[in-house]
């Protein structure tokens, strides 16, 4: 990507427009965004076409190789994270988590579009919301067991809803550990599981039913919403 010759390369934070800060914050918060997700944040493909090359040339963002079909991926650099000023350092997901993490962004965007009164906290921000509750338990006396970071938190009407986007089937023991953690963490008022495999839905429902976790925290299991899917790898 190269900036148009009619635009000067940004060399300081003062060169950025307000929408650039929104893009940089979400690049830091989520770790990675696809170009179409960045376009949603600018709200205009022409603005994206003009601003994204400037962020790249200015050292605020770092493009990935073309890994997924039909889109380019970007992450924030350390310089971009400084500009974002959201209290987090720049990071990039592992290749193993990449497709999942891009799908989580699509899910977050879908939920905020359809529930505009809500706020989203990313996996990186979740501990700020639930910090201090790990050693406390609900009335049934569950021990928290292994720690867990949900894929995101939806803050709505004073409630904290943990959100999980699940594509790969885990063992029943692993689901039991995760669901036990949700049930024994007082700051979590509900859990939404979004799954694309009936086997996952059955396993999560069975674990909650057998252990009674759904008596301590509201649990819903839903299919992936429209527009949310794990994007295919780009073929060599």
Task: Label the model's feature ranges.
Residues 28, 88-104, 108:
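A short, highly charged nucleic-acid-interacting micro-segment common to nuclease
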Residues 2-15, 21-27, 35, 169-236:
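Non-catalytic C-terminal interaction segments of nucleic acid-processing enzymes
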Residues 1-92:
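Nuclease-adjacent, charged terminal/linker segments that flank catalytic cores
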Residues 40-44, 131, 199-200:
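Acidic-and-aromatic substrate-binding clefts and catalytic sites of carbohydrate-active enzymes
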């Amino acid at each position: 990507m190269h900036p148009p010759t009619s635009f000067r390369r940004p060399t300081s934070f003062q060169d950025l427009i307000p929408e650039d800060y929104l893009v940089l914050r979400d690049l830091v918060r989520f770790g990675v965004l696809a170009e179409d997700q960045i376009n949603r944040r600018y709200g205009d493909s022409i603005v994206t076409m003009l601003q994204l090359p400037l962020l790249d040339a200015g050292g605020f963002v770092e493009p990935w190789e073309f890994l997924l079909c039909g889109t380019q991926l970007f992450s924030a650099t350390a310089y971009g994270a400084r500009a974002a000023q959201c209290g987090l350092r720049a990071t990039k997901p592992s290749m193993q988590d990449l497709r999942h993490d891009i799908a989580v962004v699509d899910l977050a965007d879908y939920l905020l579009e359809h529930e505009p009164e809500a706020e989203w906290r990313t996996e990186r921000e979740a501990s700020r919301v639930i910090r201090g509750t790990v050693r406390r338990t609900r009335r049934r006396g569950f021990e928290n067991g292994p720690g867990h970071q949900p894929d995101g938190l939806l803050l709505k009407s004073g409630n904290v809803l943990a959100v999980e986007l699940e594509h790969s089937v885990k063992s029943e023991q692993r689901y039991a550990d995760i669901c036990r953690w949700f049930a024994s963490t007082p700051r979590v008022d509900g859990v939404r599981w979004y799954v694309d495999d009936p086997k996952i839905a059955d396993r999560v429902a069975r674990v909650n039913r057998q252990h009674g976790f759904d008596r301590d925290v509201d649990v819903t299991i839903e299919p992936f919403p429209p527009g949310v899917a794990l994007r295919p790898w780009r073929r060599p």
